[in-house]
Amino acid sequence: RSTLMRSSAASDVYKRQSFTITEKGYSLANGKGELLPAVAADFAAGPEKPASYIGKVASLLYTRFKNGQLPIAMVSMDNCSHNGDKLYAAIHTFAEKWAENGLAEKDFVNYINDREKVSFPWSMIDKITPRPDASVEEILKKDEIDGLDPVVTSKNTYVAPFVNAEECEYLVIEDWFPNGRPELEKGGIMFTDRATVDKVEKMKVCTCLNPLHTALAVFGCLLGYTKISDEMKDAELRKMVERIGYTEGLPVVVDPGILDPKEFIDTVLNVRIPNPFMPDTPQRIATDTSQKLAIRFGETVKNYLASEDKDIKNLKLIPLVFAGWMRYLMAVDDNGEKFELSPDPLLETVCPVVAGIRLGDTDVEETIRPLLTNRAIFGVDLYEAGLAGLTVQYFKELIAGVGAVRATLKKYV
């Protein structure tokens, strides 16, 4: 297999390589900044027999370098911003380390850096493909299709002979292919420049999809929902995300030109999120919310503050989401029952802030001030942005007692 891959890598016919390895796949170090053992070993051993995934990719590029510096496009299609840069950074690090250690020529680094020879285009992909769902499996079994049982891998991921994915799909790629490409636009892929890819990403992440998902996740957990699609049958929750998207987000949306933001939201709210065959949960989407609020809502807040003709006071429901998240951190649902918070790297920091707050408390502003002023979480200091007062008001109403979350939604959406 290794011989075949090297043979392919040495051929000029080999024009592009795509990657879907998750954002973590590009990491060369662990959370403490320590090199992964396989990566450290590869740095020392050189490109001949690498053990790490990125090391193997860098080794194949070294093969192309040794066979006439053949051009190629390295296309990351993982769902993360500026994905091409992440792939480049990992590959470039390998090239530099090998050159520093005398295990590869310095010209190999130049080859990786030559835009005419090796490209790392950005892409934006948007297609929800959750793990194989039992309801879909049952439908297929009724059609007398056998052997569908899913398998849990050693890494606790689920695989099956079938895939349940939404029909809607978007793939936008920076048109940077040094060795040419087929006319994939005929299959619906959109090719454009880097700036436009970035705009599409911002449109999706900051306005048209991700903020709506996060809002539903926070309040879905508080109201006991276990499927995002069911939340769209809830009049208050549906109205909430409609107003966040259309009324508060669209006026300052980043318009990429190749996709219409309003049509994108229309599809999200009327087709994608309500799809019962997409068994996504508010609990899954609520994962790492502290890392998401600054991008998914904070950018809209900043755009209002920077605009000469937009009034920050028109933001009514984004502050409600901020307050809802702080209410969520109490780990008590709207029935007064405890629930388990989704994983989040800041739980040990933010949960103690609200730990002493009980339903019915009213004197809470000073208690939650450390959260309200946290730019890392919200993207802005909510006091400086002029949103702290409304956020505190909402929070007080959300903790007024059992049923207060539903009552607050009814009152304001």
Features from the language model and the residues they span:
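Single conserved hydrophobic/aromatic residue that forms the stacking wall/gate
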Residues: 2-10, 14
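Inter-helical turn/loop segments and adjacent helix faces that build the functional surface
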Residues: 64-74, 94-110, 222-239, 252-256, ...
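Primary mode marks residue(s) on the alpha4-beta5-alpha5 output face of response regulator receiver
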Residues: 88, 92, 96-206, 227-229, ...
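A structural-propensity feature for long, helix-poor, extended segments
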Residues: 245-264
